[in-house]
Amino acid sequence: MAPKRKQPYTEEGIDFKFTQFQIVPPINQKNFYTEYLKRDDQMYIWRDSAGEKDAKETESESANGDTKQDDSKKSQVEEEEDGIEESELGEEKDNKTIVLHIGSQNLRIGLASNKTPTTVPMVIARKMRAPFAQERCLLKDICHVNEDGNVAFDSEFDSNLKLLDSELKSWLKAQKKRSVPNGTQLVKNYNKISKPETVPPDDDPEKPDWIHFEQDDHVDVICGKEAFLLPLNEYPEYKLFYPIKSGVFNESDYASSQQLLADIYEIFKYSITSLLQIPVSQLSQYSVIFIVPDLYDRVYVEKILDILFFDLHFGKAAIVQESLCTSFGAGMSAACVVDMGAQKTSISCVEEGVVVPNSRIKINYGGDDITLLFMKLLMRSHFPYQDIDLKTPYDWSLANALKIKYCGLSEATYNVQLNSFFSRTPDKGTRKFTFKSLDETMLAPLGFFRPDIFENENKLHDRYTLFPVPVDVYDNQPNNPESLAQTTLLQISTPISNIKANGKDDEEKKEESDLVTPSVKFKPPRVVYCGSLAAPEIKNEKLIYPLDDAINQSIFSACDGNLSDEKAKNLYSSILIVGGAGQFPGFAHLLEERIHSKRANIPTISVIPPPRSMDAQFVAWKGACIYNRIRIVSELWIKNSDWKMLGSRVLQYKTLGYFWTG
């Protein structure tokens, strides 16, 4: 018989629980609710900002010894803080804020307290391991003499030039301007016999101070304007790199993404330390305002912010859209902003301090295309400087200077004109040329309205070869910002053979494109109805479209197709032209006429120049300085610690108007 089991000894009157954990009852799914991360004040970035604000208020109260402030006085102080900050605090803040505006050709950088920014060319000269043959672009090598004895380029260029020439003649006829008899032949005959005149070095006050190194004293990197003063024929081991192209990374000239980002870092560092005289060790005490394009590239913005935070160690940063800064700089609350840069043109409508998302358009042409077109037109007239090489920085600067000095759209200048210029090269010294021109100075700016004449084949052809396409983490689809106006123009201006089909390799697409041979050139309608349009999956994002039609499409999309609305009238009466590419004499008047001819039902169409006291290229930069004074910007600063912890996720909460998507 088994022994009896002993009972555990329990002391009467002692009631201990076996555990201290509370038993959680089952959740009633019918009444389940939570507020976790459903309010902005629960986010880390907002809780962190609120904690800093409370700490400052506590410190201020303890310093003043006035802990009990009445409600009326407190509300009065809050109302005063809603406007512009006091002058003393604002000036101190401006002295610690750097405004950064990156362009395809130049970098505008400076303290928010400065009147004008410092302009730094976005170029860097790097010493390569071995000498290499410099690229050349001689226009005389790509043109030929036809049967009539005239200089001509390819057939497509000549056909587009005939259309451009007929359009100019019809416009001059409407202005009751007579053509010059035998003017073209007079220009060619003079240019054929024009010879350069050598200028002694002592007689040239603007002689460039070319860089010459001592033996074994070469530097690895030269940034900014100094890179243009390097004689590449004497130092073939150096190569010029342009890290930004058409407002995005220039991936075609680089072998790796690290090299491209390193060049941008070197240009930033040179601009801040050498030109602004601010050591890198003190940048943690500074803030930076980064002006981003309206139709920005996510990878571009994120990589630039990585450089600002991780490499330069800025304390805080804020990003703001380009058109919004332009409206601030011009003092306009509503406008259609047309920013005409060196390699791209941006169009956006701003209303009440917010960029209308569906109105944003980016066109891939700019002032550089006008420069190249102008030089081609001069070569057709036997330009005396036949050896001009547009790949060298000094000859390209010369061509750009000729465009700025002589091009215009004023009918009063339509005549045979005698012009002169100085060519300064390191190998041939200074030479003076004289030449005559007739309609070349007017035909070149007209290219904005017939952009098919530009060289558009190789634009953005190496896009996304070094950096990945930004995609959404959930559906793995591209998530760069989209605009209905941009999508519309891409659909109606892209030939069917350029549309990329899913699941087809390059050989299959090539075979299909060989089968498609359109007999008639496709001419799309100028404006289409703004309905629900899905963006086509195209090979690249290149958009070439007439400027006046693009402006009409932008305003059309901003008003949801209702041109009779008061909003459309306000936008058409305030078309703001900024940037360096659209400041030709008479250009604004011609643009106004062309828009009015297609929008006759709009009573007032006005193309507004920038303020008189401000350079058209500095309006956006100056607007960012004004943005720095607005009280709300204190809530939009991204701290270095925020970026290190959250990365790009912080941008959707820290942008004015919440324009960052994803």
From Swiss-Prot:
Species for this entry: Schizosaccharomyces pombe (strain 972 / ATCC 24843) (Fission yeast)
An example Gene Ontology molecular-function term: ATP binding
CDD domains: ASKHA_NBD_Arp8-like
Location(s), subcellular: Nucleus
Pfam families in the cross-refs: Actin
Residues covered by region (Disordered): 50-92
Superkingdom of the source species: Eukaryota
Keyword Nucleotide-binding included in the entry's annotation: yes
Coiled-coil stretches: none
Any Gene Ontology biological process: CENP-A containing chromatin assembly
This protein's name: Probable actin-related protein 8
Keywords linked to the UniProt accession: ATP-binding, Nucleotide-binding, Nucleus, Transcription, Transcription regulation
